[in-house]
C-alpha cells in the first residue's frame, strides 16, 4: 500500500484576508437587513493602518459603513496599535458606486422572459454572471466534509477560542492551521500525519511556552474528540510557529483582500472550485448562491446513500435563468448508475437562481457568520444549504427509474 498524504489549511478570523471577508459580509448583512432585495458587490482591502471598501450596490437602504468596519475589527480583536492595527483609530475609505444598469436589467428580466412568453416566475430572474460552481460532500465525517479541512477548521476555531476566552494569554488575532492526513489506496483517511499551528503573539511569549500551551489547549483539545482518536499516533508531527516568532501580524504584516481564501472557504482542495469567491456578494450572484445550492445537492446525494462521495457542477450564462450545464461526479463510489443519480438531481432540485433564493431562503442577513471557518459543514450554525431535506425524494427518484 502506497503512502498518500493530503493536506488542507484553515486560517483564523484575524488573518488579513479573513478580516476583509468579515467586513464585506458584515456590510452585506446590514444592507440585506435594510433592503432584502439589495444588490451588493463589496470588496475590502486592508493594509497597515487603513481599510478600503469598494464595490457596486443597488439598494433602497442606508448603512454606516465606516462604523461597521470599526465594529468588525474590534470584534475580531484588533483593538490596539501595539499589535499593529487598531479598529478605533485606523483610516477607513469608502468608494461605493451604483450597480451597472445593464447587469441589473439582465438579472431582473431574464433571457427567457425577454425572448418568449414564459409566465413561470422562476424564469424571470437571470443569473447575475456567467460561471461554473461546484458542490461536494463525502461520508468521511458526520458533517459530510473531507476530514482534513474539518480538522483544520476545528483547530483554527479553537485557536481563536483560547485567545478570546484567555485560556491562553499573550495570543494575537492572526493565525493559521494546517493538517496532513495519510490516505489509503481506497481513498480512506487512516492516520493524522502532521499538524501545523502558526499564531501571532505578544513579544513576551516564548516559542517553547507557545508550543506547550497550544499543544495542550488547542491540538490536544481538538484531537481528544472520540471520532479523531483512531487517526492519532505517537509519531504525529506537530509544528508550532515553525518560522519562529510571529509578533507582527494582521494587516500590519500582510495586506488583505476579500475573496482570497476560496479553498479555505470550501473543501480544503479536496474538490474542484469554479473560481468565484463568496464574501461581499448578495445571493443574486450565482458565485455564492449556486455554490451553496450544489453543496445542498451533493450532501443530500451522499446522505441518501447514493454515493460515498459526490461532486456537483452547475454552470450559468449571464442573464439566463436556466443552468446551461449540470454534471454529477461520484468518483466510482456510486451505489446506483450515475446517469440515474444525475436524472434524479435534475428532477428533485430546481437550480434556477430564483428557485435557489426561495428554497434556501437566502435573502436574509446570514452571511457574516460564514466569513471565517468555512461555509460548509458548520454544525455550529443553522445554514439552509446544510439541510438534509431531499434525501427521500432522491431515493424515490432514483428507485423509480
Swiss-Prot record:
Known EC number: 2.5.1.6
Signal peptide positions on this chain: none
BP-aspect Gene Ontology terms: one-carbon metabolic process; S-adenosylmethionine biosynthetic process
Cofactor note (record): Binds 2 divalent ions per subunit. Binds 1 potassium ion per subunit.
GO molecular function annotations of the record: ATP binding; magnesium ion binding; methionine adenosyltransferase activity
Pathway connected to this protein: Amino-acid biosynthesis; S-adenosyl-L-methionine biosynthesis; S-adenosyl-L-methionine from L-methionine: step 1/1
Catalytic reactions of this protein: L-methionine + ATP + H2O = S-adenosyl-L-methionine + phosphate + diphosphate
PROSITE patterns on file: ADOMET_SYNTHASE_1, ADOMET_SYNTHASE_2
Keyword field contains Cytoplasm: yes
Residues binding K(+), per UniProt: 43
Cofactor field: Mg(2+); K(+)
One Pfam family per UniProt: S-AdoMet_synt_N
Binding sites annotated in the UniProt record for L-methionine: 56, 99, 254, 285
Gene Ontology cellular component annotations, sorted alphabetically: cytoplasm
Compartments in which it is found: Cytoplasm
Transmembrane segments: none
EC class name: transferase
Keywords in alphabetical order: ATP-binding, Cytoplasm, Magnesium, Metal-binding, Nucleotide-binding, One-carbon metabolism, Potassium, Transferase
Biological role stated in the UniProt entry: Catalyzes the formation of S-adenosylmethionine (AdoMet) from methionine and ATP. The overall synthetic reaction is composed of two sequential steps, AdoMet formation and the subsequent tripolyphosphate hydrolysis which occurs prior to release of AdoMet from the enzyme.
Complex and partners: Homotetramer; dimer of dimers.
PANTHER family named among the record's database cross-references: S-ADENOSYLMETHIONINE SYNTHETASE (PTHR11964)
Name by which UniProt lists this protein: S-adenosylmethionine synthase
Highest classification ranks of the organism: Bacteria, Bacillati, Actinomycetota, Actinomycetes, Mycobacteriales
Gene name as annotated: metK
Amino acid at each position: 500500500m502506497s503512502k498518500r498524504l493530503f493536506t488542507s489549511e484553515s486560517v483564523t478570523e484575524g488573518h488579513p484576508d479573513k478580516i476583509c471577508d468579515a467586513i464585506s459580509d458584515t456590510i452585506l448583512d446590514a444592507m440585506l437587513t435594510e433592503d432584502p432585495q439589495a444588490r451588493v458587490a463589496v470588496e475590502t482591502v486592508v493594509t497597515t493602518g487603513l481599510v478600503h471598501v469598494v464595490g457596486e450596490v443597488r439598494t433602497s437602504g442606508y448603512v454606516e459603513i465606516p462604523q461597521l468596519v470599526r465594529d468588525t475589527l474590534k470584534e475580531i480583536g484588533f483593538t490596539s496599535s501595539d499589535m499593529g492595527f487598531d479598529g478605533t483609530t485606523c483610516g477607513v475609505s469608502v468608494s461605493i458606486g451604483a450597480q451597472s444598469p445593464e447587469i441589473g436589467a439582465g438579472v431582473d428580466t431574464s433571457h427567457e422572459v425577454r425572448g418568449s412568453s414564459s409566465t413561470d416566475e422562476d424564469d424571470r430572474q437571470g443569473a447575475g454572471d456567467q460561471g461554473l460552481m461546484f458542490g461536494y460532500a463525502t461520508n468521511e465525517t458526520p458533517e459530510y466534509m473531507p476530514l482534513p479541512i474539518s480538522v483544520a477548521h476545528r483547530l483554527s476555531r479553537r485557536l481563536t477560542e483560547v485567545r478570546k476566552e484567555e485560556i491562553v494569554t499573550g495570543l494575537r488575532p492572526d493565525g493559521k492551521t494546517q493538517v496532513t492526513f495519510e490516505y489509503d489506496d481506497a481513498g480512506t483517511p487512516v492516520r493524522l500525519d502532521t499538524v501545523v499551528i502558526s499564531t501571532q503573539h505578544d513579544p513576551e511569549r516564548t516559542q517553547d511556552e507557545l508550543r506547550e500551551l497550544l499543544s495542550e489547549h488547542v491540538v490536544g483539545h481538538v484531537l481528544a474528540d472520540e471520532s479523531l482518536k483512531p487517526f492519532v499516533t505517537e509519531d504525529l508531527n506537530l509544528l508550532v510557529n515553525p518560522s519562529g516568532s510571529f509578533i507582527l501580524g494582521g494587516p500590519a504584516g500582510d495586506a488583505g483582500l476579500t475573496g482570497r481564501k476560496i479553498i479555505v472557504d470550501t473543501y480544503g482542495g479536496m474538490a474542484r472550485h469554479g473560481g468565484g469567491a463568496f464574501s461581499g456578494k448578495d445571493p443574486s450572484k450565482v458565485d455564492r448562491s449556486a455554490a451553496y445550492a450544489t453543496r445542498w445537492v451533493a450532501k443530500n446525494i451522499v446522505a441518501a446513500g447514493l454515493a460515498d462521495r459526490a461532486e456537483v457542477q452547475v454552470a450559468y450564462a449571464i442573464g439566463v435563468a436556466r443552468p446551461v450545464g449540470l454534471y454529477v461526479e461520484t468518483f466510482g463510489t456510486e451505489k446506483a448508475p450515475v446517469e440515474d443519480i444525475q436524472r434524479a438531481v435534475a428532477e428533485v432540485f430546481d437550480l434556477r437562481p430564483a428557485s435557489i433564493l426561495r428554497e434556501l431562503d437566502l435573502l436574509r442577513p446570514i452571511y457574516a457568520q460564514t466569513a471565517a471557518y468555512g461555509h460548509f459543514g458548520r454544525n455550529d450554525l443553522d445554514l439552509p444549504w446544510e439541510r438534509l431535506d431531499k434525501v427521500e425524494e432522491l431515493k424515490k427518484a432514483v428507485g423509480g427509474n
